[in-house]
């Protein structure tokens, strides 16, 4: 799961402990100079002022989150910028929950501990390019992790994941299918919705390592169909790989390009005063 520099993310650590799933692997990308490296369990690179990721508040961080460490784990993070970074992970095989979620992310509330109502957004687009070439040894998936609050408050209302590249990522309860895209350069695609505990998961039917996502209508669909409260607001967005196992060997996960673009609703233009007839 995501560590996004918000105090309420103690909740994430509690919830992730219950996330049990299988999890595919990554190939190395091009070598680029790193400005930050860390192998600490919860090591953080940042803050970055990265114009390709727009938000309401806070800076962008890249985190080496290891939420459920097991004996023998090793994971190192090497960051050039929030859109180009890589992780080398060595996590023993076994029927384990998600061990780590190396990820880039930040907050979208008016403060670090609040959310921004979805009604205040005109669009939320994101694009990605990553390498995760699955083998039989690794259990992992590339995913957005989106946390929502109630209106502009700090009260948590839900967690939504968007998975687009995965292998052996466990079973979840199928709920529905829906089609999104067609604006902002995002292709029209059909997604499957399933539920895993308290988590709502949008999944592409087939893997995609380069693409774009129209996030706002996916969240509004969940509100309209009763999966999220009507007053839901955007709290935080993370993006990375949830890793369960690499089979006890070193595997590389590479992010080559990443962006999030948010556009607020434009205020209504002032109307000219009406003239009295006379």
Go through the PLM ranges and name each one:
Residues 149-217:
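Short helix-loop boundary/capping segments
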Residues 10-20:
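Bacterial N-terminal signal peptides
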Residues 1-10:
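Bacterial N-terminal signal peptides that target proteins for export
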